[in-house]
């Protein structure tokens, strides 16, 4: 009779990857995710961005986080976050918090419109009122696939 190992090995986090139109900027998102945010602030509305969030670099849980590489320019119209664009094709790739608590990684979001549609089609949309109330709005059952034209 052999002993059975009952310790579960950690399930790897799903990986979602995206890139800008010209391919110069690439991001990798490694964390469980169920929602993508559609924000109605003046910038997100104009670009049609849909966001998923985690920490830049290694996340809080092992095997999670966001990595982004490429030649990007920063646009920071407000006080708390910077938007990251490809310098060549100007796709909006991500935003990054300007500050983090001491010793903590920076909070970041990547634009799922730069991912393969099949990788993100199932994500539910969380509407965020970034224009007036700065609050999440009730879920309405729509998913990212409902936003592809």
Please identify what each model-predicted range represents:
Residues 2-19, 24-149:
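A short Gly-Trp-Pro
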């Amino acid at each position: 009779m052999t002993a059975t190992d009952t310790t579960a090995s950690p399930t790897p986090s799903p990986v979602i990857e995206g890139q800008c139109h010209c391919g110069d900027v690439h991001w990798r998102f490694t964390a469980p995710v169920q929602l993508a945010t559609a924000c109605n602030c003046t910038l997100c509305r104009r670009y049609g961005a849909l966001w998923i969030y985690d920490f830049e670099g290694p996340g809080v849980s092992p095997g999670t986080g966001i990595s982004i590489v490429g030649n990007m320019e920063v646009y920071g119209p407000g006080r708390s976050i910077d938007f990251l664009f490809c310098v060549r094709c100007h796709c909006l790739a991500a935003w990054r918090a300007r500050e983090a608590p001491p010793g903590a990684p920076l909070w970041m979001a990547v634009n799922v419109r730069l991912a393969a549609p099949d990788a993100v089609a199932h994500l539910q949309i969380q509407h965020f009122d970034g224009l007036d109330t700065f609050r999440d709005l009730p879920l309405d059952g729509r998913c990212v696939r409902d936003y592809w034209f």
